[in-house]
């Protein structure tokens, strides 16, 4: 088994901004584009014009490379817009990188944006079992963790309510409880301390510390430098999509 839990190699993510939305082309339009497109591109190049696609893009990540070993606790820090959340979305396969590659070796539990991974029409109870099934757990395994998850999240009274009716704080509490208690080998957490009261934040830090002491890998995005210093062994600093 490899010693590397997470590897990013030359990772880049580009987004198109502005411009018209893409639509399906007719067969006639596709044939015309196939013939005329290269001719127009050569003409534009000779005139020194740039392609519109090149003008209207933004790189959220560019040439990001790092390794996280099994059992390490690593913080990801940087200003708003530095690319931290985009990095976790690429690592969790929510979005594909434009260039480079990301490698994850182990079962992943993650909490990204509020409600990510939950089906809004399903109840809290149903979403707990759905999340466990997605992680490859058997029902008996989830049963053993169920009470602990519910107690940590503090949503006992709302277990049979669809999560679309949960407040953002309730969704984050349940999402973190599911991610941290279903025995992930790798835990990816994005700004969980930005939502919830001080008591919940303290519980989250305590649970992440327990996960780390159990030999699991943790990648923790946060603006809370004190929390990163206390919890993490090292940190990755992102600035405008680049590792600094």
Model features per residue range: what roles?
Residues 27-49, 109, 129, 141-158:
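Conserved ABC ATPase "signature" region
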Residues 230-237:
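Conserved catalytic segment of ABC-fold P-loop ATPases
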Residues 2-63:
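Pre-NBD coupling/linker segments of ABC/ABC-like ATPases
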Residues 240-241:
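Conserved ABC ATPase "signature" C-loop
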Residues 224-230:
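Conserved H-loop
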Residues 77-79:
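The feature captures the beta-strand-to-loop junction immediately N-terminal to the Walker
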């Amino acid at each position: 088994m490899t010693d590397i839990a997470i590897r990013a190699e030359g990772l880049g993510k580009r987004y198109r901004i502005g411009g018209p939305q893409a639509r399906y082309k007719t067969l006639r339009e596709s044939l015309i584009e196939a013939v005329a497109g290269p001719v127009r591109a050569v003409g534009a190049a000779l005139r020194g014009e740039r392609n519109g696609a090149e003008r209207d893009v933004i790189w959220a990540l560019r040439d990001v490379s790092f390794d996280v070993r099994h059992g390490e606790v690593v913080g990801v820090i940087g200003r708003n817009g530095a690319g931290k959340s985009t990095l976790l979305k690429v690592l969790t396969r929510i979005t594909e990188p434009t260039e480079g590659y990301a490698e994850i070796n182990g079962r992943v539990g993650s909490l990204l944006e509020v409600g990510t991974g939950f089906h809004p029409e399903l109840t809290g109870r149903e979403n707990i079992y759905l999340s466990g099934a997605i992680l490859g757990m058997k029902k008996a395994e989830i049963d053993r963790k169920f009470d602990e998850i519910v107690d940590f999240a503090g949503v006992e009274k709302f277990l049979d309510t669809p999560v679309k009716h949960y407040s953002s704080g309730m969704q984050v509490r349940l999402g973190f409880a599911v991610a941290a208690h279903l025995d992930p080998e790798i835990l990816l957490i994005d700004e969980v301390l930005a939502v919830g009261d001080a008591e919940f934040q303290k519980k989250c830090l305590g649970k992440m510390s327990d996960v780390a002491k159990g030999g699991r890998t943790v990648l923790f995005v946060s603006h809370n430098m004190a929390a990163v210093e206390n919890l993490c062994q090292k940190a990755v600093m992102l600035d405008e999509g680049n590792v600094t």
